[in-house]
């Protein structure tokens, strides 16, 4: 079954009663004031067709969803072994900002989608690029087909003001020899990436390359190889939703990536990319209503990688 606007709107109506049962991220002050009632879903087919319902054009802070794009950029700059000797490919089973395993495992983060792993990726970008923030924005604008996307300076500044834990993670990795650059410039880049403001439609278009073997919308050349696209989807399926990755795989059955801004992106390889947005989060930091909406959509259209 192919999603229709009516199907998507009906799913949003079904999950709307969940609003009020989660919690908007408040540890980043600039995000705490977001309306909890926002709810949207957008589907982008590999041919560029968009089907959407709800609040799909309003931009929000994508936060950890940006970790997929920063890893994509790193994959285009480094040989695989240069990346994977510094960050692992395993689920962590701990909170996204945990330091427990990092101490026990000699400063090597479990995967690139927890904070420690994303900071290593940001460190890699800082080592190889003269203007990493510019290159990241250039990539996202290209993938989304939207030249007007920007960083949210207020959100980035808010995160920098409350950066003690992320700085501690970076300094701990540096003490193990797994951080090449000065910590604060890398943190500045990292928070800028997280502050990207995008809509459901922007994100669905952006992630089309992972549904199409590395080929972005409207492009003639892949941005990562078919093999790398497959590997990225594997990582998203096992590590993309923090310590809720197993629950998401069980309920939704698609590779996915979440952010504490309330967005979740999911991939149906070979067919479509999907974005949902609902700012209230579950205890793992994933969108409560968004996960439920994706579960219903997967069931109704009969899609799963399992």
Swiss-Prot record:
It is an enzyme of class 3 (hydrolase). InterPro entries: Beta-lactam/transpept-like, Glutaminase. Gene3D superfamilies: DD-peptidase/beta-lactamase superfamily (3.40.710.10). Keywords: Hydrolase. It comes from Photobacterium profundum (strain SS9). GO terms for molecular function: glutaminase activity. One of its GO terms (biological process) is glutamate biosynthetic process. Homotetramer. The gene is glsA. It catalyses: L-glutamine + H2O = L-glutamate + NH4(+). Belongs to the glutaminase family. Substrate binds at residues 64, 115, 159, 166, 190, 242, 260. This is Glutaminase. PANTHER family: GLUTAMINASE. SUPFAM superfamilies: beta-lactamase/transpeptidase-like (SSF56601). Coiled coil: none annotated. The lineage of its organism: Bacteria, Pseudomonadati, Pseudomonadota, Gammaproteobacteria, Vibrionales. Its EC number is 3.5.1.2. It comes from the Bacteria.
